[in-house]
Design a protein with these regions (language model features):
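Residue-level recognition of short, solvent-exposed, well-ordered loop/turn junctions
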Residues: 75, 120, 135-137, 247, ...
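Catalytic-pocket segment enriched in acidic/His residues
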Residues: 59-63, 69-72, 89, 170-286
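A generic local secondary-structure boundary/capping motif
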Residues: 6, 69-71, 98-101, 125-134, ...
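A structural-propensity feature for long, helix-poor, extended segments
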Residues: 116-141
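A short secondary-structure junction signal
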Residues: 92-93, 121-124, 129-130, 151-156, ...
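RNA pseudouridine synthases
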Residues: 85, 144-147, 151-166
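Structural signature of FAD isoalloxazine-binding scaffolds in flavoprotein oxidoreductases
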Residues: 98-120, 136, 270-274
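N-terminal non-catalytic cap/leader segment that marks the start of a structured domain
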Residues: 2-104, 108, 201-203, 211, ...
């Protein structure tokens, strides 16, 4: 990679990470070194979502190097999500006794999370003291790259920077108490994102495989693919941008594909999305 400036709108076929080196946060491109097969962070000057563009600083660090910590790949101003956007998840919620509705609703069910709910890879997910039933929900998240307002379905993907993994952590025992799900889905640490952003053209977002690992064991009933989304990603962007302005860095949680499950203190939760990577967090009691 040369030192020329890359403008945000032209970012393609890349992985974009946000990391700290000795507690100094910065952005990087993630590259795999063919000589050893390891991932390296190519540090950047500038912000990937800023109009001025970015360019390599000349520094390179191993992703797992000393003093390196991956952060949430963006700090969104807004996070929106879609509930019951897969028929399998809607049926699971009904069979588990969490919903009176057996099938997915015809209209989109959109909720929000505050920006303070966002954490990064390896950050702890904290069970609030007022909950005893916290659940994982593995998903693919959309990261916006341009200001989007009243965009059409046909235009929608032009406004996307890329995709990342997300765990839409939910307090099931509070979800039925608040119609807006504010406490159930908006508590601090309820939105782990990472490990990085894969740019739009470098992911088969129409058929991205999603899976989940709990304490080293694959949870087969939690797996699925974005091919089974009821409301597709362009439709989600068009719908949300019809009532609010989406800014660069804003995040949309596209839906969990199948079953979810309980999390206990000490659990290791890993969301995996084919073509993106793995997002790991450990659960602690607050």
């Amino acid at each position: 990679m040369d030192d020329s400036t890359i403008v945000a709108g032209r970012l393609a076929d890349m992985r974009i990470a946000r990391f700290s080196h000795n507690d100094v946060p910065q952005y990087a491109f993630v590259q795999t070194d063919e000589s050893d097969g390891k991932d390296y962070l190519v540090a950047l000057e500038g912000h990937p979502l800023a109009g001025a563009g970015v360019k390599p600083t000349g520094e390179r660090f191993p992703v797992d190097g000393d003093g390196i910590r991956l952060l949430s790949p963006v700090i969104p101003s807004k996070v929106y999500g879609l509930a019951k956007n897969y028929e399998a998840h809607a049926q699971f919620m009904h069979e588990a006794g969490h919903s009176d509705i057996k099938h997915a609703p015809e209209d989109m069910v959109i909720f929000s999370k505050p920006s303070t709910s966002v954490i990064g890879p390896d950050d702890p997910i904290v069970i609030p003291s007022y909950s005893n039933d916290m659940n994982f929900e593995p998903e693919v998240a959309v990261v916006m790259g341009r200001i989007a307002k009243n965009v059409t379905v046909e235009q929608a993907m032009d406004y996307v920077l890329g995709f990342t993994c997300v765990n839409d952590v939910t307090l099931r025992d509070l979800q039925g108490l608040d119609p807006m799900w504010t406490r159930a889905k908006g508590f601090d640490t309820s939105c782990p994102l990472g490990p990085w952003i894969v740019t739009r053209d470098d992911l088969d977002w129409k058929d991205a495989k999603i899976s989940f690992t709990l304490n080293g064991e694959d949870v087969e009933l939690a797996s699925g693919t974005t091919a089974n989304l009821i409301h597709g990603i362009p439709e989600q962007i068009a719908a949300i941008s019809s009532f609010t302005t989406l800014l660069p860095g804003d995040v949309i949680l596209t839906g969990t594909p199948n079953a979810s499950g309980h999390l206990d203190p000490g659990d290791e939760a890993i969301v995996h999305a084919e073509g993106i990577g793995s997002l790991r967090n450990v659960v602690v009691r607050g």
